[in-house]
């Protein structure tokens, strides 16, 4: 599990957290942290049935639509494959809704795909043809299905700059064989 400056008693909010499976898994490993899972109201019953009783004092659910302004102050806001499904216009809106509650030292942690570069600065292929084809097909699926593309690191930086120049990618952790990466973003108030 990627460790993004975990601090005891900090509050972690997962936006679009569904039944809370990620927050529950983290809570089992980090007993001094508190979690709020935010998602649409219709998910709450499913969340409650999924929550182990021994974690109920540290993991809770709050109805929230991430297209609306954030309403809690958390130390870390976490989103897993949330922005992936939205074009830049809507992804900017989702992240912008966090701004009033971000403070110096706040983190935004994304678990998202980071499309690798296919070519170097001289136009030479740096990944095999079969992989370039696979990545292109993923791009086309996202374009047809959600009117967006898989984002490269430069695209993630551009998206964050559209929200606020104080948002800075501090680290990108990719793991062998994994489709998703952890993008650790700090707020320089």
Task: Pin down the residues of each PLM region.
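Alpha-helical subdomain
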Residues: 2-189
